[in-house]
């Protein structure tokens, strides 16, 4: 997937040879610059791999979560009030109704 979009690999950059002219660039400067580019490419590649793995993991988690039964939300206000009333009777007993 990513290989289709990226034109150069770190290895290709490393192995690239430049022709020198009469007053060409300093080879040492070119090598240093290419080394920086290679390090960046390797860092980007590693980051992309990690993000793709995380993306797959999150998609699986989402799929699993959507397959699970939804939490029962059948508890209505009436049920809550009924439970509350029973708890009050149990805690306060007959004091509540005196």
UniProtKB/Swiss-Prot annotation:
Its main location: cytoplasm. Residues 34-71 form a coiled coil. The gene is gpsB. Forms polymers through the coiled coil domains. Interacts with PBP1, MreC and EzrA. GO terms for cellular component: cytoplasm. It comes from the Bacteria. The keyword Plastid does not apply. Keywords: Cell cycle, Cell division, Cell shape, Coiled coil, Cytoplasm. InterPro entries: Cell_cycle_GpsB (IPR011229), DivIVA_domain (IPR019933), DivIVA_fam (IPR007793). It is found in: Cytoplasm. Divisome component that associates with the complex late in its assembly, after the Z-ring is formed, and is dependent on DivIC and PBP2B for its recruitment to the divisome. Together with EzrA, is a key component of the system that regulates PBP1 localization during cell cycle progression. Its main role could be the removal of PBP1 from the cell pole after pole maturation is completed. Also contributes to the recruitment of PBP1 to the division complex. Not essential for septum formation. This is Cell cycle protein GpsB. One of its GO terms (biological process) is cell division. Belongs to the GpsB family. Induction: By high-salt conditions.
């Amino acid at each position: 997937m990513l290989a289709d979009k990226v034109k150069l690999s770190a290895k290709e950059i490393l192995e690239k040879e430049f022709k020198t002219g009469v007053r060409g660039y300093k080879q040492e400067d070119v090598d240093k610059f290419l080394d920086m580019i290679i390090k960046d490419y390797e860092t980007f590649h590693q980051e992309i791999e990690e993000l793709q793995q995380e993306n797959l993991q999150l998609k699986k988690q989402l799929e699993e979560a959507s397959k699970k039964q939804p939490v029962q939300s059948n508890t209505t206000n009436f049920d809550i009030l009924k439970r509350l009333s029973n708890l009050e009777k149990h805690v306060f007993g007959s004091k509540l109704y005196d």
